[in-house]
Amino acid sequence: MRRLLATTMMLLMTTAALAGCAGSDVTQDDVDAAYDNGYAAGTADAASVSTLDTIIARGALKCGVKDSQFGMGYLNADGTYSGLDIEYCKAVAAAIGIDSIEYILATGSNRFELLASAEIDVLIRTTTWTTSRDAGLNADFAGMNFYDGQGMLVNLDQFTEATSALDLDGANICVGIGTTTEGNLLDYYELHNMQMTTINTENAAAAQENFLDGSCGVWTGDMSAMVARMWGLRDEGMNLAIMPELLSKEPLGAATRDNDDDWNDVVAWVWYGMITAEEFGIDGSNYGDFVNSENPGINRLLNSNLGLGTDANPLSDTWMQAVLGAVGNYYDAYDRSFCDGDGEMANCLINRAGTLNALVSEGGIQYAPPMR
C-alpha cells in the first residue's frame, strides 16, 4: 500500500510541477513530506528502471494469476498450473530467457494493488480492459488473450422456469468484489426494471459455497468462468443452466504498470507473435523447419529482435523460437487449456471455432499487427 501511495504522490507532484503558476492542491510541504518518508525518491528510482531489467537481475518472473478457473488459471492437484493465462505467462518468460516463474495469486480485489506495488511483474488473470482501469489505475494493458462476455449460471431448482436472464427478477446473485461484473449486473437490472440482491464474494471458493448452500440462486461472471464452474459442479447433483444472454463485452488480457513501455511492448508482442505463428502455420512441433525460410515475414518472426527489450537486456533474435519451443502458437496454447491437448481441438470445454477467439481468417477477431 505504501508503494501505491508513493506512486500516487509522485504523479501528483509531477502534475504540480507541470502546472506551474496554474496552481495545485499539492504543496511544498506535501513534497517535503514525501521525500522525508522516502516515497518520492523510491518511486523516482523505480520509474527509471524497466521491469524487464529487474526481472533479468532477479532471475524469475512474477506473474499474477488465478488458481481456481479451469481453462484460464487453475492450480492442479499435483501443484502445477494450467490454463490460457498460464500459457501466456510461460510464453513471456521464454521470450526473455527466464526459466523460473513465480505464480502469485491475484484476487479480484487486490490484483491492481499487487501490480502497482511491484509485488507482481505482470497481471495475467482474466482481467477486463476498461477505460477506468487503463486511465485511473496506472495499468497499461497488453495482448488480449481471450474475448469473453458476462454470463449467468442459474440453479434451476430455485428458478424452475428460467430460460433467460430476464426470468431472474428478485434473484440473489453471487458476484465477485472488485470486478467489472458488479457494474454490468447493476446496469442490466436497472435497464430492465428488475430487482435483485447481490451477494458479494471475495473469491470463487466463497461464491461456490454460497451457490451450493442456496444463499444465491444465480452466479455471474465471465462466461468462460461460468462454463468452467458448471463443469466443476457436474457431480453435485444440481440442476444447472447458463442463460443465453451475454451482459457485456469482456476483453481479457495482460496488464503492466504505466510508463514501463519497454516491458509492456514485450508482453504485448509475445502474444502477437503466437497469433502470427499460427497464421503462418508455424507451431511448437514444426518451427525448426521454418528457421531458414525465405519468406521475409517468417524470417522476421523467427530470427529478429524487432527492437524489443531494453538497452541493457534486448531480446535475442530467436526469442520467438524460444516461445514456440515453450508453449507453441496460439492454437497450441488454447488446445491445451480448453481441449484435450492432442492438437485437434477436440472435446473442448469452450470451443474456439465460430467464436470471437478464432483467428480473423476463421471468422473471429484474434489478429496481430504486422511484425516488422
Model region roles, listed by residue range:
Residues 92, 115-116, 168, 207-212, ...:
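Hydrophobic residues within well-ordered alpha-helices
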Residues 49, 56-125, 330, 359:
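Extracytoplasmic small-molecule ligand-binding "clamshell" domains
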Residues 1-45:
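Secretory targeting signatures
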Residues 308-372:
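C-terminal functional modules
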Residues 62-71, 79-95, 148-206:
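Bilobed "Venus flytrap"/periplasmic-binding protein-like clamshell domains
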Residues 38, 42-58:
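Bacterial Sec-exported substrate-binding components of ABC uptake systems
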